[in-house]
């Protein structure tokens, strides 16, 4: 099953997340099909906190991909700010 979820990156105590489309059986930070955005929870100043390609997310959902709870909230906030 294809899912859209967060893959953690960054350093210790400094998380940075990629929003990825992946097979649900793959490891959290493992192989993915497509990167559709990022989320930086520690963004300060002019740093961008969230970038999401909503068109690609909607494409994958139309293809049957499931969305994690956290990513669903990020999609909602991305649509609201756009």
From Swiss-Prot:
Keyword Transcription regulation applies: no
InterPro entries: Ribosomal_bS16 (IPR000307), Ribosomal_bS16_CS (IPR020592), Ribosomal_bS16_dom_sf (IPR023803)
GO MF term list: structural constituent of ribosome
Species, as recorded: Proteus mirabilis (strain HI4320)
Gene of this entry: rpsP
UniProt-recorded name of the protein: Small ribosomal subunit protein bS16
Keyword Ribonucleoprotein annotated: yes
Family: Belongs to the bacterial ribosomal protein bS16 family.
Keywords: Ribonucleoprotein, Ribosomal protein
GO biological process, one term: translation
Matching Gene3D superfamilies: 3.30.1320.10
GO cellular component terms attached to this protein's record: cytoplasm; small ribosomal subunit
């Amino acid at each position: 099953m294809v899912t859209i979820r967060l893959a953690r990156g960054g350093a210790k105590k400094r998380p940075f997340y990629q929003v990825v489309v992946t097979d649900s059986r793959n490891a959290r930070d493992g192989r993915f099909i497509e990167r559709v955005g990022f989320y930086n929870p520690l963004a300060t100043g002019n740093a961008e906190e969230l970038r999401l390609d909503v068109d690609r997310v909607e494409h994958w959902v139309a293809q049957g991909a499931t969305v994690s709870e956290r990513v669903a909230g990020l999609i909602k906030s991305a649509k609201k700010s756009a």
